[in-house]
Design a protein with these regions (language model features):
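Short, aromatic-enriched amphipathic alpha-helices that serve as compact interaction elements
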Residues: 3-21, 29
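Structured beta->alpha junctions
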Residues: 15, 40, 71-73
Length: 151
């Protein structure tokens, strides 16, 4: 008997679509009114058209981005997944008024997604990133100063 939860298959296919940079496959797994919220950057997209624009931006900034799931927790209607992303920045990145230029160096950072489902479709995706680790990986060496200047 297979004890795998049905959402485990959905989230595995979702991860494959992200790693394949297949925007249409990603969107096909979302409800029409799905919400994509990045709690680290503050960005929010509501609906597939807005989510498409977020995805285009992510894949343009990090054309080789890949997510590796570290742990996945599945309950009825909810998936929480811890992951490590690895990518090479392809465009300038600005935080706190400071801009880092692409270096060609591959970086990695950790995060967590909280994903409520409506049936087998993603109703919402809440993304939480280790922002200090992400900024350090990008080369922001004075991260504390950036955070303090934004208060």
């Amino acid at each position: 008997m297979n004890s795998e939860h049905p959402l485990e298959q959905v989230i595995a296919a979702y991860g494959e679509a992200w790693n394949g940079h297949d925007i249409e496959a990603i969107l096909a797994m979302h409800t029409e009114d799905s919400v994509f919220q990045n709690h680290t950057s503050g960005g929010q997209a509501i609906g597939k058209a807005a989510i498409r624009e977020i995805l285009k931006g992510v894949f343009a900034a990090f054309p080789d981005i890949r997510f590796d799931a570290r742990r996945t927790y599945v309950r009825d209607g909810l998936v929480t997944q811890e992951w490590t992303a690895s990518a090479t920045l392809a465009v300038p990145y600005t935080s706190g008024g400071v801009t880092v230029q692409p270096t060609g160096k591959k970086i990695s950072w950790n995060g967590v997604d909280v994903i409520p489902f409506a049936g087998n479709l993603i109703a919402r995706k809440d993304v939480y990133v280790d922002s200090m680790g992400f900024l350090r990986a990008l080369g922001f060496t004075q991260v504390g100063l950036i955070v303090a200047s934004n208060r």
